[in-house]
A protein has these predicted regions:
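Hydrophobic/tyrosine-rich beta-strand signature of extracellular beta-sandwich/beta-rich modules
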Residues: 66, 126, 174, 232-234, ...
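Periplasmic plug
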Residues: 737, 741-782, 806-814
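Contiguous segments within soluble domain cores/interaction surfaces
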Residues: 25-45, 50, 56-57, 63-101, ...
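Ligand-binding face of N-terminal immunoglobulin V-set domains in extracellular IgSF glycoproteins
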Residues: 109-113, 122-123
Length: 904
């Protein structure tokens, strides 16, 4: 079922949030009013991507389903109609980006991983334009290991040891093997150590008989330059050059610990829970134990970490006392840390979050602040209020018993108010509510199947008592023998993504663990996450003052082209100018409009795909073309540091070595039947005929003439009017669509055009006069494109003009009143290939079916009865298949279910 049918049957059922009992004070009523206004004006969208696999290899396809929700109850969003999904490379640059239409909050897409991509830790990032106004921590941002056995069959085995001397010396040992474990002996290895963008060491080594190199370096600023990478350039015996990036997560064994009093402060005379978090220098939790001592050296309390370096203890702090923690870490190191200062005046919260039906909140005040006053508790998330109540203090405390049934699942902020509008204490909790989860069962007609046998999967969502059982779902089936996975705690899941990670500041270690087989102990562990990482997105000072957050990016409802028409070489707007847009593709014909009094024009509700080029033409009111057209450009989202950086894998090829072997077998079989282009690792050494061609003034970073193909002026046909026409059919491994060149290695990514050293869009090719061209150099092989990094991932065409040393040819392409425009359109989603072995005449029936992703079904929608089904055929290899289904229903209930079958 496709997106359009889903739109036709999906009706989002909004419902109101129940408020609490208790008579509020005028101050609280004002706060609640401001919170409501904030929630209405700045609703929070979240994104989850369901991927078909937890990791990939170069040559693979990444298949994903996107879910965009809004508000605390995770209802499918109608606010934004466009989703951006980026694949960010190890160099922290965007390698691929797609723009996808959202239909009732859902979409689907894919990435093709070209052979030119290197091994490394990639990131898949998703967001709407509206989400860009807020902290990037709310983006969907996941570390994605991608291995390479197509153009890089070298497996690195890295280890780093540290000496915590004043200069922090690091000893590195790296062993290089092939996928079968054989060593790469006598291989030259050039290395460069980069920490936080600074080069701190470089050198050259040759591997020994076991394929090993070893070198030392010193990080003189270990507390400023905490992480980095080792860049390797390897020269193999068969004259290949392989580049690798090995993450260097730390250069120190220095551990740290922080203490977090519940609700922010230790209030004298009150039992106080203090959480703590111990971290190794790589940002991962480390085991620790210790004791708390007062100023007299008396042991007051003891503590020990639970999971991920976190834990908590309780004691009664005394006024005027100072407390120190003595800690021993799991690696044997020790430290002493002062606890926060004890406060003699103030407020505090104590929360019991372990009861099934209610939440107990105790509000404490110091004696000087009691005086029979009232205190108010507000439970909210990003301005959406779920509970508000005011109680009079009895002595120095007030107790609130809050029913859980009306609280949504996920992160909730508890805020305490006294006699003013600014909070006096805050505490974050995670609320568990089964009503926020959609019951989902998976059934197959059998539990055991033969090879290449049809499997029918039946899904049942919800229960008969539900008012609606319509749900949007997606299913991924993988062969676990060919795609080995761990216990699943390192995989992504819809539960932690939408309920936890998007509402927590910073890195959460293995968030899926808290939702896999949850029990009382894991509830306590999750509460430690809240105590150590909970934060408020509300700036209370600004809220009370009526100061609004800056909104730069509006929710996008459709594709648009807009801009302003001005007098030529000036800034004076031209009103009533006629503006016409014409697409060069088949999606859109001609559309025109008239500028307003400010000279502005806007074409909205457009529908076009990525490879569409537009000509925008303007004429003034009298039909004259002596005007300038300036188009609006929304800047692309910058690549910021990922909060999930500690999830990076040090040696990707090694970590998924079994998978890479399996994909090699699969790719070889596909190549045999012409379904995949064969990779030639030695393309870079082909020098026949090419060296005879003289290339002058070339900006080729590999050196003039060092290309996969060179076309000279003499070879260009002068019977063509534009360069793209001249080159069609002449460039090996290059196809043209609408005048735009694509390498057959990366058929969905335009080649990078470099004109006299200036980087240009591929769509500029038709505007270049072929009579002015001296040479055209084509770079397709990894050996030639590697130096261009992510800019060369789709291939490079280097054009040198006959005045190539002038450096300004590209800027001379100008026509008054007309501009060409190649905006990012919608990505044209491909369909997952699913073989049908019931068709005996299938020409591919003899091919070995070595799929790793057995099936991908992104468009499942259950009916009113909660039922849906899909089918697929098993593959060639025996083993255990995992069927994982995720999604949510129209009420925002989240669904996740797993089922296993055996193939013999």
């Amino acid at each position: 079922m496709g997106l359009h049918r889903f739109l036709s049957i999906l009706v989002i059922c909004w419902f109101t949030t129940p408020m609490a009992s208790g008579q509020g004070t005028p101050i609280i009523e004002e706060v609640l009013s401001k919170l409501e206004s904030h929630a209405n004006r700045y609703p929070q969208e979240k994104v989850y991507l369901h991927l078909d696999k937890p990791y990939y290899a170069v040559g693979d396809d990444i298949w994903f389903k996107g879910y965009v929700t809004i508000g605390a109850y995770n209802q499918l969003s109608g606010l934004s109609k466009i989703l951006y999904v980026d694949l960010v490379g190890p160099e922290q640059t965007v390698v691929q980006s797609v723009r996808l239409p959202l239909v009732a909050g859902v979409t689907m897409g894919d990435f093709q991983l070209a052979d030119s991509l290197s091994e490394g830790n990639y990131r898949i990032r998703a967001y709407t334009n509206w989400m860009r106004n807020f902290d990037t921590d709310i983006f969907y941002d996941r570390i994605l290991p991608i291995g390479n056995a197509r153009t890089d069959n070298i497996v690195a085995h890295s280890s780093f040891s540290f000496e915590n001397s004043p200069e922090h010396q690091v000893h590195a040992e790296i062993k290089f093997t092939d996928l079968q474990g054989g060593p790469f002996a006598d291989m030259d290895a050039n290395y460069q150590v980069v920490m936080e963008g600074r080069n701190i060491a470089r050198g050259r080594e040759t591997t020994d008989g076991d394929g090993r190199i070893a070198f030392d370096f010193v990080n003189k600023q270990p507390f400023n330059l905490k992480s980095g990478e080792v860049l390797l350039r390897l020269s193999t015996a068969d004259r290949r050059t392989v580049h690798k990036r090995i993450p260097l997560k730390t250069t120190s064994n220095t551990n740290s610990i922080r203490f977090f009093p519940e609700s922010g402060q230790m209030l004298a005379g009150n039992l106080t829970k203090v959480a703590f978090k111990a971290l190794a220098s790589d940002g991962i939790g480390i085991g620790a134990a210790g004791s708390i001592y007062d100023g007299a050296g008396t042991r007051i309390a003891e503590f020990e970490t639970d999971y991920a370096g976190m834990g908590n203890f309780s004691f009664i702090p005394e006024a005027g006392a100072r407390y120190t923690a003595s800690i021993m870490y799991a690696d044997g190191s020790e430290s002493k840390v002062d606890l926060p200062e004890v406060q003699i005046s103030g407020y505090a919260l104590a929360v019991n979050n372990q009861l099934d039906r209610q939440l107990i909140v105790q509000a404490y005040a110091s004696d000087d602040l009691v005086q029979g006053q009232q205190v108010s508790v507000v439970l909210h998330r990003n301005g959406e209020v779920f509970y508000a109540s005011t109680n009079k203090q009895a002595k120095n405390e007030a107790v609130f018993a809050i029913p859980r049934e009306h609280l949504p699942a996920g992160v909730i902020q508890i805020t305490l108010f006294a006699n003013n509008r600014i909070p006096v204490a805050e505490r974050t909790i995670f609320n568990t509510n089964d009503a926020s989860l959609l019951p989902l069962t998976i059934e197959t007609d059998w539990e055991t199947y033969r090879r290449k046998e049809k499997v029918t999967v039946k899904l049942t969502a919800g229960q008969p008592s539900d008012t609606s059982r319509i749900a949007a779902l997606s299913a991924a089936v993988i062969d676990m023998a060919r795609v080995p996975i761990d216990s699943g705690v390192h995989e992504g899941s819809i539960y932690p993504s939408l309920l936890l990670s998007a509402d927590i500041k910073g890195y959460v270690e293995t968030p899926n663990r808290y939702f896999k087989d949850p029990d009382f102990a894991r509830g306590l562990q999750l509460d430690n996450v809240m105590l150590t990482q909970g934060w408020s997105r509300i700036d209370w000072q600004d809220l009370v003052a009526g100061k609004s957050p800056t909104v730069t990016y509006s929710p996008e409802q459709a594709l648009r082209i807009s801009g302003v028409v001005t007098k030529r070489n000036g800034k004076i707007p031209v009103p009533n100018a006629k503006v016409t847009i014409l697409s060069t593709g088949n999606v859109l014909a001609v559309v025109d409009t008239v500028t307003d009094a400010e000279g502005r024009f806007n074409f909205d509700r457009l529908l076009f795909y990525d490879d569409t080029k537009f000509v925008v033409q303007a004429r003034d009111e009298r039909g004259r073309k002596n005007v300038d057209v300036v188009l609006d450009e929304v800047p692309r989202q910058q690549v910021t540091r990922s909060k999930n950086a500690p999830d990076a894998t040090v040696d990707v090829n090694q970590s998924i070595q079994t998978y890479l072997k399996n994909t090699q077998q699969q790719f070889e079989e596909l190549e045999k039947y012409g379904l995949k282009e064969k990779t030639i690792l030695l393309e870079e050494v082909k020098v026949t005929e090419r060296a005879e061609k003289k290339v002058k003034h070339s900006s080729n970073l590999n050196g003039p003439g060092n290309a996969d193909q060179v076309i000279t002026a003499e070879e260009l046909s002068m019977g063509c009017s534009t360069l793209d026409i001249c080159l069609q059919g002449r460039l090996h491994g290059v196809i043209f669509r609408n005048g735009v060149p694509y390498s057959t290695r990366s058929p969905n990514q335009p080649m990078q055009i470099v004109l006299d050293g200036m980087y240009m869009e591929a769509e500029a090719l038709p505007m270049i006069n072929p009579f002015d061209v001296e040479t055209v150099e084509v770079l397709r092989g990894i050996g030639n494109t590697a130096v261009y990094g992510s800019m060369g991932s789709g291939g490079v065409i280097i054009i040198t003009t006959k005045r190539g040393d002038s450096g300004g040819y590209g800027r001379d392409i100008y026509t008054p009143g007309i501009v060409t425009h190649s905006p990012q359109g919608y990505y044209e989603v491909r369909e997952f290939y699913a073989p049908d072995y019931s068709v005996s005449a299938d020409s591919l029936a003899a091919m070995k079916d070595l799929r790793t992703t057995i099936h991908w079904a992104p468009s499942i929608v259950t009916g009113d009865d909660g039922m849906a089904s899909f089918e697929f055929y098993t593959a060639e290899s025996p083993g255990v298949y995992r069927i994982m289904v995720e999604g949510l229903d129209i009420s925002g209930r989240l669904a996740h279910a797993v089922h296993y079958i055996t193939v013999e």
